[in-house]
């Protein structure tokens, strides 16, 4: 006898490029929807934003880090989204998606320094990091070693239909 059970689908919503300079109007629309429907997304926060495209947006008129802390208190997961979000290599890394990276192709000491500095900023701002979210979906095995050495054991990437 075969029994078919209905299983509820589970989804993970992921937002990246969260920084002091970004389109906060769009973000607050999503925030309102997520809160209304009790959705707890993962947000990739850039600790030291130097992304020239994001810097074109005006700096938020409120305490950015308090906003991130309030989201974490709501149960949102916070991911380290690189350090500066500045692409310094043309290495696509493990996934081969984009030919640009903040991390992939750099030596261990530079990658480790970026992870350490990013993590330190979060600690100074009284935030706990739940994961790492690579800018441009590009990281390599050296990035993975730097993450593990800094006690970050979860990465998130949103470019597949199935887990890998």
Task: Tell where the protein language model's regions lie, with residue ranges.
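Catalytic alpha-helical scaffold of carbohydrate-active enzymes acting on polysaccharides/glycoconjugates
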Residues: 1-131, 138-164
């Amino acid at each position: 006898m075969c029994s078919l059970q209905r299983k509820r689908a589970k989804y993970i919503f992921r937002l990246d490029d969260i920084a002091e300079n970004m389109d906060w109007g769009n973000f607050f629309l999503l925030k309102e929807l997520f809160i209304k429907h009790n959705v707890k997304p993962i947000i990739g926060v850039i600790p030291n934003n130097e992304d020239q495209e994001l810097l074109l947006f005006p700096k938020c008129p409120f305490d950015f880090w308090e906003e991130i802390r309030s989201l974490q208190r709501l149960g949102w997961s916070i991911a380290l989204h690189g350090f500066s979000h500045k692409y310094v290599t043309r290495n696509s890394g493990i996934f081969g998606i984009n030919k640009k990276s903040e991390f992939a192709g750099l030596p261990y000491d530079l990658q480790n320094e970026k992870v350490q500095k990013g993590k330190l900023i979060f600690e100074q701002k009284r935030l706990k990091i739940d994961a790492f979210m690579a800018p441009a979906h590009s990281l390599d095995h050296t990035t993975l070693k730097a993450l593990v050495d800094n006690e970050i054991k979860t990465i998130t990437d949103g470019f597949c239909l199935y887990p890998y």
